[in-house]
Regions:
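Start-of-domain marker
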Residues: 20-80
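Residues that line or immediately flank small-molecule/substrate-binding pockets and catalytic motifs
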Residues: 8, 60, 146
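Generic alpha-helix initiation/capping and coil-helix boundary signal
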Residues: 7-12, 39, 81, 135
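Bacterial Sec-dependent N-terminal signal peptides
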Residues: 1-29
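Alpha-helix initiation/capping motif
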Residues: 21, 55, 153-159
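Short coil/linker segments at helix-helix boundaries
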Residues: 64-158
Length: 159
């Protein structure tokens, strides 16, 4: 009886962990189909689980989703998170930290180029809204992205 109980608990834990990683995969599908609200909901749920906390793919997906939220022309998507571009940056930073196999530098370089543009646009919006401290922080982030080893490793300096 104990063995059966132990096996059942082990199977439950394995299934629950797989379900969380499945949410990341499903979030990617929603992102690809343009359903950013659903993608955000799923990635947020998945990131709350310990099986995704140390998974580089989950953070890369989170970065893509939040970056897409910021870049979206749909106002309802932009309203989902006013700090989406900053959260995308934080997620990409976590990818660099977790990517021990170095699978993501080329993918991150693409995202970084777009992220620099996003932060430039955000800085301009904030400057025009007379939020100078936030605008300066966004401009500093652009400089940080441009000088990042992800972009400078290939000899790229300007975006």
């Amino acid at each position: 009886m104990r063995k059966l109980s132990f096996i059942m608990i082990l199977l439950f834990c394995a299934t629950f962990t797989y379900a969380q990683k499945g949410k990341v995969t499903q979030a990617i599908s929603y992102l690809t189909s343009g359903k950013l609200d659903q993608a955000k909901k799923l990635i947020d749920e998945a990131m709350g689980h310990e099986s995704c906390v140390a998974w580089d793919k989950a953070y890369f997906t989170k970065g893509q989703i939040y970056q897409a939220l910021y870049e979206s022309p749909v106002a309802d998507y932009k309203k989902l998170d006013s700090e989406a571009v900053e959260k995308a940056w934080e997620a990409y930073q976590k990818v660099i930290e977790l990517d021990v196999k170095k699978k993501y530098p080329k993918k991150l370089a693409i995202q970084y180029r777009n992220l620099a543009i996003d932060f430039t646009n955000r800085a301009a919006e904030l400057y025009n809204a007379k939020e100078f401290k936030k605008a300066l922080a966004s401009f500093k982030r652009v400089l940080e992205i441009k000088s990042s080893p992800i972009l400078t490793a290939n000899g790229e300096v300007s975006i």
